[in-house]
Structures are given as C-alpha cells and as structure tokens.
C-alpha cells in the first residue's frame, strides 16, 4: 500500500467516523427531545385509576359520549356457544372522576321483522330458514361467516300503520350474523324467495333500515349522553388492551344499567374539550396545499366541561418562538417533530371532544394528508383505538331545513369531533360564517389581525414575528371555545341527545328525521308495534294544503294591536284529535271495521282517525310526554340556583320544544323515514279551521252591540296567531281585552288546544302576508323591542345597505314617530349611493351556494361568480354550502345581472366601478316602498324621483397614493377620504413626511375580508398612526366600531416613506388610539 493510499484510507475512516458521530448525536438529540416532551406531556394526563377500578372490585358508572361497533371474533368466555366474527358494540365515555372508558359490549345481534305468511308452522319456518341461508350464502360468497341467518323466531307484533282491531299477529324475527347482512337479507326478501306451497313470494320488511348502534340503544333503553352503570363482578378487564382508555373492559349487553337523565344522573361528567387551530405557510398567491405547504404552528386549549378557563394552553411552533405569558410555547426544529408532538399530545391529554372552526373540512384533513406526504405513518392514530387511523372522506349533507353542504367526514374513533362552523351553519342564519364575523356577532370579539398573505413572512422572520403568529393561532383556538361556552352547545346537544335518544354524533351528521324516528321506535317497542320501511309506508304521492294565512289588511296602525297565539298548535292538534299512524282508518277498512261514528274523528281534509277511547296514538303519547317534560324543566329552571344546573335545564327545555315541533314535519316529509300525508294534511286543515273560528268568535263577541266600546277587527292571521284591533288607544286596555278573548275562545276548543294572549304591537306596520313590524309590548309600562318578520332587517340575501336603511327607517317611524325624518333619511341614502359616497361593504350581497353551477336551471349571480372564482383559484373558491359574497358592477348595456356579479376583493384590487342603479332598482326600491306605501300616498314619486336622484358620480376605487386626494392645510396633515369601503380614515403624518401606500396595501393592512358580506359591524371611522417597530415604520390602524358594540380592533402593517428621511410620528401608547374622531372634517373625493 502506498503512502497516498494510506492517507486516503485514513481520510475515509475519519469521514465515516464523523458521519457516524453526527448520526449518533442526531439520534441522541431526538431521544432527549422525545424524553423532554414526554415529561412535559405527563403533567397533562388524566387522574390515575383508584385501586377499586384496578382490582375490578367496584362498579363502573360513566357518562357515554359515543357509541359505535366493530366486527371482531366472538368473546369465548362471555359467549361460550358463539364463534366466528360478530358485531361488538363499543361505548366511550367518562366517569365522574374524569377517567376515560371504553366498554366493549357483547351478545347483541342485528335483526329485523317480516310478516309471517298464514299457516306457517315450525317445520315451515325451519325450511324457510334453510332457503334464506342458502340465498344469503350465494349473495355473500366472499364472507367467512359460518352461519348468515342465526335464527328465525315467531313473535307476536302488529304493524304501526293503520288502525287494527286485533291486538297482534304472527311476525318472523330474523336474526343475522352481522349488521351489514340486514340490507343483504332485506334485498333478497324484497325481490322474492321460493317457498313450498307459496311459490315465489316477496316480503315487506319491518325495521330493516334501523342503524345497528341505534337498535342497540333502543333495546337497552340507552339515550344519547346518559349515564351507564356496570356492577362489580359483571365486567371483565380486556385481556389485551385495544384502546388508549384508562378503563377498558368487556361485558354482556344484558348487564348494562341505563340511568334516565334525571336528578343526580342529569349532571355532566368532566369531559376534556380540546380546541385547536393550525397555521400553514402557503406560497405567495396560493391557498395552502398539504402536498407542498408545511404546518408551522398548532395551538391547543384544553378545558374541563363546566369550567370557564382552559387548564392547558400551548402552541407548538416550527422554529423558535418568543415567550407568551400564560402559554406553554413548544418550539421544534422540523415539521415532522411538530406533527408527532401533537399526536403525542392528543394521546396523553386524551380529549373526549375535539372542537375548532372548520376543523372537519380543513385542519384535520390537512394534518392527515400532510403527514401522508411526509411519510409519517404513525401520525393519523389520533383516536382512542390502538393502530386505528383517522379516516377522512368527502360527504354531502342535504336536508330541507339545513340545505345542501359539501364537507368532509372525519372519523376519530372514541372522540366526538365538534366543528363549530358546521354547528353555526345548522343552528343560526347569518350573512357570513367566517370565524371573525361569528365571533364579532356573538362575543363582540375578533381574531388577531394577521392577513393570510403575511403568514409565511412572519414564519420566515425571527422569534418575535413567530410569536405574533402564535398569538394569532392561539386566538383562533380560543374563539371556538368561547363560542361553545357562550352558546351552551355542549349542554344543548347533550340534552337533545337525551331527549331524542340518539348518539351525540348523529345530531352533528344527520337531519331531523332520525330524532323523531328514534322516539317512535322506542314507543312502538313498548307496545309491540313494528315500523315498516319508509318507502313502503303511508302515502307516497300527492301534496296537501298548507296552513291558513288570513288576508292581511295592510296599513300603519297607530292603535294597539293585540296578538292571540296558539300554544304549540300543531302538537296540540295531534294530541286533541289523536292523529297517528296507528289510529288512521283507511277508506276501504272503514265499513269492514264497523266503528261507531262517535268513536272517530273525521278531519276537515276528509281523513278518519279513531278516538283515544278505542286506541291512544303513539305520536300523541310522545308529544304529551315531551310537552309535560318541558313544563317540568321550565319549572325546575325557575327554582334552580346552580349556574350549571340552569344551563342543563335550559338546554333540556329547548330540546323538548324543538323535538315536539319536529313530529309534524316528520309525517309530512315525503322523502322521509315514515311519511304519512294523511296526518300532516289533517293537522294543517284543523289549523286553518281554528284560525277562521277564532276570527269569527272575536268579531262576533267584541262589538258595540255587546257593550264594548268599539267593534273588534281581525286584521291578520298567520298559521298559529291572530292580530286583533280592539279599537282602544291604551296598551293596557288592549292587553285586558286580549286576555278576555283568549280565555273565551280557548273554552270552545278540544283540550289541550289553547289560545293565549302574549303581546301587543303598538304602533304596528302591516305590509303584507308574512311581512310586518311593530313595537312589541308584554307590559303596559314600556315596549320590549322592535319586532320584525319577513322584511329585510332579518333577511340574509339583501345587502347591508338595505338592512340598515330599512332598520333605521323603521326606528324613525315606530320609535321616534318621525315619518318626515324617515323620508329624508331615505333620500339622503339614495343620493349617497348615486354620488358614490356609499361604503362598499354595505353593497355586498351574500347568497348560499346549494348546488353546483350545472345543477341550477336558471343562471344565478352568485353561482356564476363561484364558477369564475374557481377558474381563478380553485383552492379559495366557494364550495357547496358556503355563502358567496358579491357586488354588482358596471357592464355593457343589456348585460345580465349574473354576468355583472363580482368578488368584492377583486373589485377593489382591480378598480372596477359599481353599478348604483342596480342597487337602487333591485335592492332598495321594493323594500322601501313596502314600508312607505301604507304610510305615504305617492311613495314611489316622493322617494325614488326628485332632486336627490339627479346628481350621479361614477368613480372607481383608486390604486394611486392615498394623499393624491388631500390638500396640505396643517403641519400635521389630517385627511378624510373615500377609499372604496368608505370608512373614514384620519391619517396623522409627521411634518414634511410623505407616505406612499397603495389601496392594495391598505386592503392587506385592514383585512377587508373580515368586514365584507355583512359581518355585523358598521365601521364608523379609523385612525392610522405611524410608529417605529422592529426597525421599520409600522402603521397601526384603529377602527371605531358602532357605539353599541364598543369594539376596538387594530392591525399592524409596514408602510414605505418616499422622502428618504427618518422622521416619524412619536410612539403612541395603545390607549391613545382609542380617541373619538372629529366628525366635522370635509370629504375629499376622487374625481372620475
């Protein structure tokens, strides 16, 4: 070997040694970091199990949150006579001590019913069993199940459909091996099966569409969110733990003790609620994509149910981050470390409920797909089952009440994912569902103002800039928790689950009908009734006449109008007349059954139902129980002192009210679980009859001939209420007459139908059917509020200008009693619109996207815009279920409205002019005329024509320097300008300093999207101060919001000085920013 070769070998050895040492140091560092993280996480684990639980010597009592099932091998010890794959029910919950529970329930089997053919005996059943087993084996050739049809039993049941004089008849209960085989078996029976002596026969199936978990809950008398007990000695610790729960055990379903949610068992367990948010570093001009863009921060807040403040606050950051007071900042060097740390955090903290805003559509799917791209196979194990990965799939939810929405279903086994965005869309009608807008509306709080376009810059900065981003991320995790508490979602949803008997997750993922069906199945089971499949039940065709609305006598009433309301009208009708599936007599049976005429109710729509003396209906029984329970809950609520108990009781009474009102809709849903138009049409026909009856009695009794001062006049009737003008001038007198009328008329109705007096409107503006406004009085001393129905103050699809204009006019007319002032106010607003002095945010229209563009028969403005936005940037374009904000722009003459709709941000950034005439003719004119026509003789001529409509200015948003519009008047220059949104800006600039800042920069600075789409704020003014921060000039913008809200919002954005000097304004304390604006400064407007 030469000397040169020796040196080469030595170099290789040294290099290999160095590489080895580097790898070893990396491994050691990774181990140290993991150990440090484990030590950190250990503080946040659940309390340890007591000796009694460990030794299985004490009973287990827990509140269940989630129920599902899994297919696994039969438990040999609990079920010695069973083998092969079976369905095992899993119940997840929490004990009162805060221990997590996974209860594996064995022995419950799926089943359904068919009507037994006449003359079928035990031998025939055995042969039928063999034939059905053979057909099942053919249909499921790839299955490893030993026996598909476990057994067939003859039982005595009766169909819920139609009145029958016999108590019961033979049914066959078919028990199958696995839940998925119910549908397979049903299909075989629907198509027909060859039977000896009967030939090819098809069978009507009963309860074959009941979900397996719900079937289990019904048969075991378990309702959503209730407490379940298992006595000591009746459960066995799972031999090999399959979950991460502290308590995991197996038991037979017959050993479960289900407690009704009353008294001590109405309380809530200390659930752990995790609220989280993620931030991603997107590329410039692109919405973050998990295939390219890293997750840079994850903020977490964990709260115990019933407590105000989180007991865990942390943020996991990629790279260093400066400390945040009260927050555990956890920096990591790589994205892989961030994701795995969050996975470990989830496992250690073990949350029962995971919340956030849009987490099901964005945060969770993004994390899962990002980990997949980084090849972190172990990341998606976020549920409570070992080695089980989170599953994400696209879903489309559609119902008449909630509309159609595209989303994603995220299955985190053993935990409830509670997406606040989805809940807000289901429960509230808002113009905008952005987190900023919703938080502003309900909490008077807003997000930290960091525009998405600078997130990557903040991440690429230093520890201080990443701290700013972390505060932003933490706020986005904090606001959903505040919304959850403020709106009492946990209490309300748990109570709804308890009342209706469905799992909590069903309330989030399904419509209304499953809740009524659950109650119906429970009551039917108690009475040995069975429910046929929906498609074969009741009437499938036809429509029925809706509720009566008495002709509205439009006008402006300056005397009190008493309102008489029916208490729970539709539920009361169903109870009073015993309307139910099982009390309905079909025409062909009416003569055969030979029912005495006095024992039936013939409804105004021509249907026949037996009275309760022959058979009490199930629907009336359910309604009676719900309404009685609601009265009890409301009475308990008045007596309750504990805030948590009050929250539970209030949630319960609300759930009971909603459930009672849902029953009628369930019967009328033609594509529902069990439609029956005979019931729904009978209910509405009785309602129409009662409204007419009430009108006649009021106008017959309250007359001058009967000694009253004036003749009463019914000016309007709407579904379940009647408006009466008794002619008196005093509110108190109208109230007394209203009470007298309600008591007199109630006595003429069948109980429990009751007419109640609740309120007086004074004054009252009746515009047309379903449209009115008035001051709402429940006490004679003072009015409670201004109440409106069907007009633009409560409609979401009008621009904010219309809502504000209508609301302010009504305020002047009804409260100020200043009609001339209201007229002048409208003229001023129209003039401002035509002269381009109107805030752009007031012109934004929002509409829901319920279908894709191809599914609409007629082209719509918001739909066409959504398609154009999708072509520009598919990632940020609206999806089905979103609300689309847009404005109408100037275009060629004859262009359709759908061709002129445009994204407000796009309009601002591209200096596109707005079409004021569209807004005048299509947005303002009709709502304003509806209000003023009952008041003014020539409303159209006075309001929409005249000198205030003759001056028109069309200017576009400018992108040149903002000082182009100002004149130098003082050393400290003060300007007000019209900047697209027409907020008022007051810019304070150091002497001789010049600011160069484009409209586009201001758009970023002010986060315009936060305020577009009618977010609920009317921005009156703003101040911009320029100070030095991080060695660069920074603009701090203060918004002065509507005085009633007192919101103070400020953002920071770098600005460029053009004179090359280093002169800046003095540094202001933040408190100095909250000064009132000078409102006397003259406008300086751009000229077209």
From Swiss-Prot:
Signal peptide: none
One Pfam family of this chain: POL3_N
NCBIfam families per the UniProt record, alphabetical: pol2
Native organism taxonomy: Eukaryota, Viridiplantae, Streptophyta, Embryophyta, Tracheophyta
GO molecular function: 3'-5'-DNA exonuclease activity; DNA binding; DNA-directed DNA polymerase activity; metal ion binding; nucleotide binding
Protein name, per record: DNA polymerase delta catalytic subunit
Keyword set, alphabetical order: DNA replication, DNA-binding, DNA-directed DNA polymerase, Exonuclease, Hydrolase, Metal-binding, Nuclease, Nucleotidyltransferase, Nucleus, Transferase
Quaternary assembly: Heterodimer with subunits of 125 kDa and 50 kDa. The 125 kDa subunit contains the polymerase active site and most likely the active site for the 3'-5' exonuclease activity.
Protein family: Belongs to the DNA polymerase type-B family.
């Amino acid at each position: 070997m030469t000397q040169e070769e020796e040196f080469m070998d030595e170099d290789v050895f040294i290099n290999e040694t160095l590489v080895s040492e580097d790898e070893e140091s990396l491994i050691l560092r990774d181990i140290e970091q993991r150990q440090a993280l484990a030590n950190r996480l250990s503080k946040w684990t659940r309390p340890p199990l007591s000796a009694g639980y460990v030794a299985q010597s004490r009973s287990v009592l827990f509140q269940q949150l989630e129920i599902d099932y899994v297919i696994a091998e039969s438990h040999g010890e609990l079920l010695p006579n069973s083998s092969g794959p079976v369905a095992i029910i899993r119940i997840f919950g929490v004990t009162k001590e805060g221990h997590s529970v996974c209860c594996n329930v064995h022995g419950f089997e799926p089943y359904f019913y068919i009507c037994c053919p006449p003359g079928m005996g035990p031998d025939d059943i055995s042969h039928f069993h063999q034939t059905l087993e053979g057909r099942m084996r053919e249909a499921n050739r790839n299955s490893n199940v030993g026996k598909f049809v476990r057994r067939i039993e003859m039982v005595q049941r009766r169909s819920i459909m139609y009145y029958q004089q016999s108590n019961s008849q033979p049914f066959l209960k078919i028990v199958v091996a696995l839940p998925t085989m119910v549908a397979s078996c049903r299909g075989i029976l629907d198509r027909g099966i060859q039977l000896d002596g009967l030939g090819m026969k098809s069978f009507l199936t009963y309860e074959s569409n009941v979900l397996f978990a719900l079937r289990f809950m019904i048969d075991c008398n378990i309702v959503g969110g209730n407490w379940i007990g298992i006595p000591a000695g009746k459960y066995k610790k799972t031999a090999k733990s399959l979950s991460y729960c502290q308590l995991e055990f197996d038991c037979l379903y017959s050993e479960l003790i289900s407690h009704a949610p009353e008294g001590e068992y109405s309380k809530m367990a200390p659930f752990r609620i995790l609220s989280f948010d993620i931030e991603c570093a997107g590329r410039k001009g692109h919405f973050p994509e998990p295939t390219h863009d890293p997750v840079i921060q994850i903020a977490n807040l964990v709260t115990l149910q019933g407590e105000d403040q989180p007991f865990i606050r942390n943020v996991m950051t990629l790279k260093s981050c400066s400390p945040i007071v009260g927050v555990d900042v956890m920096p990591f060097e790589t994205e892989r470390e961030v994701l795995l740390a969050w996975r470990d955090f989830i496992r250690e903290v073990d949350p029962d409920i995971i919340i956030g805003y849009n987490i099901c559509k964005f945060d969770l799917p993004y994390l899962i797909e990002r980990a997949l791209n980084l090849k972190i196979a172990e990341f998606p194990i976020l549920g409570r089952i070992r080695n089980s990965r989170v599953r994400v799939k696209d879903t489309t939810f559609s119902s008449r009440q909630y509309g159609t929405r595209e989303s994603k279903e995220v299955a985190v086994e053993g935990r409830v994912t509670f997406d606040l965005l989805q809940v807000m869309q289901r429960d509230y009608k808002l113009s905008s569902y952005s987190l900023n807008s919703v938080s502003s509306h309900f909490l008077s709080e807003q997000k930290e103002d960091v525009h998405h376009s600078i997130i990557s810059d903040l991440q690429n900065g230093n520890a201080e800039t990443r701290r700013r981003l972390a505060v932003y991320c933490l706020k986005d995790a904090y606001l959903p928790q505040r919304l959850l508490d403020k709106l009492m979602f946990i209490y309300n949803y748990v109570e709804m689950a308890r009342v209706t008997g469905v799992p909590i997750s069903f309330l989030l993922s399904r419509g209304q009908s499953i809740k009524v069906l659950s109650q119906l199945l429970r009551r039917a089971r108690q009475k040995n009734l069975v429910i046929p499949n929906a498609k074969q039940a009741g009437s499938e065709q036809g429509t029925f006449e809706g509720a009566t609305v008495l002709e509205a006598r439009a006008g402006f009433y300056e005397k009190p109008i008493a309102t008489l309301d029916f208490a729970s009208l539709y539920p009361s009708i169903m109870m009073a007349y015993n309307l139910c599936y099982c009390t309905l007599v079909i025409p062909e049976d009416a003569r055969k059954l030979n029912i005495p005429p006095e024992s039936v109710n013939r409804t105004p729509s021509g249907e026949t139902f037996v009275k309760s003396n022959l058979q009490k209906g199930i629907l009336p029984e359910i309604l009676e129980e719900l309404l009685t329970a609601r009265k009890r809950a409301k009475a308990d609520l008045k007596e309750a002192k504990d805030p948590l108990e009050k929250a539970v009781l209030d949630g319960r009474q609300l759930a009971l009210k909603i459930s009672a009102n849902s029953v009628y809709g369930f019967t009328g849903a033609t594509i529902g679980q069990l439609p029956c138009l005979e019931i729904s049409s009978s209910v509405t026909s009785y309602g129409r009859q009662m409204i007419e009856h009430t009108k006649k009695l009021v106008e017959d009794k309250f007359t001058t001939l009967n000694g009253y001062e004036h003749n009463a006049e019914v000016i309007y009737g709407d579904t379940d209420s009647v408006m009466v003008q008794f002619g008196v001038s005093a509110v108190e007198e109208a109230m007394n007459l209203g009470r007298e009328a309600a008591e007199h008329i109630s006595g003429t109705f069948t109980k429990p139908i009751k007419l109640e007096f609740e309120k007086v409107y004074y004054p009252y503006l009746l515009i047309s059917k379903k449209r009115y406004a008035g001051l709402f009085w429940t006490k004679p001393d003072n009015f409670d509020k201004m109440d409106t129905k069907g007009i633009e103050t409560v409609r979401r699809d009008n621009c904010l200008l219309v809502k504000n204009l209508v609301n302010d006019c009504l305020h002047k007319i009804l409260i100020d009693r200043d009609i001339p002032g209201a007229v002048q106010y409208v003229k001023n607003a129209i003039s401002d619109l035509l002269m381009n002095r109107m805030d752009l945010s007031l012109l934004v229209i929002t509409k829901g996207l319920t279908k894709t563009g191809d599914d609409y028969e007629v082209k719509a403005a918001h739909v066409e815009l959504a398609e154009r936005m999708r072509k520009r940037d598919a990632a940020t374009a609206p999806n089905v279920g979103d609300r689309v904000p847009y404005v109408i722009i100037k275009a060629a003459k004859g262009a359709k409205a759908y061709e002129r709709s445009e994204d407000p941000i796009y309009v601002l950034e591209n200096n596109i002019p707005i079409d004021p005439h569209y807004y005048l003719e299509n947005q303002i004119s009709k709502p304003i005329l509806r209000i003023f026509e009952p008041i003014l003789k020539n409303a159209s001529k006075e309001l929409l024509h005249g000198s205030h409509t003759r001056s028109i200015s069309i200017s576009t948003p400018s992108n040149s320097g903002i000082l182009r519009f100002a004149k130098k008047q003082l050393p400290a220059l003060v300007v007000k300008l019209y900047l697209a949104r027409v907020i008022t800006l007051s810019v304070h600039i150091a002497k001789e300093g010049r600011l160069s800042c484009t409209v586009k920069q201001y758009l970023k600075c002010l986060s315009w999207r936060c305020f577009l789409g009618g977010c609920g704020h009317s921005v009156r003014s703003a101040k911009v101060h320029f100070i030095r921060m991080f060695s660069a000039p920074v603009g701090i913008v203060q918004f002065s919001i509507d005085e009633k809200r007192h919101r103070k919002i400020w953002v920071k954005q770098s600005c460029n000085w053009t004179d090359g000097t280093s002169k800046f304004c003095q540094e202001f304390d933040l408190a100095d920013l909250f000064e009132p604006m000078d409102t006397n400064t003259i406008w300086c407007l751009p000229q077209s």
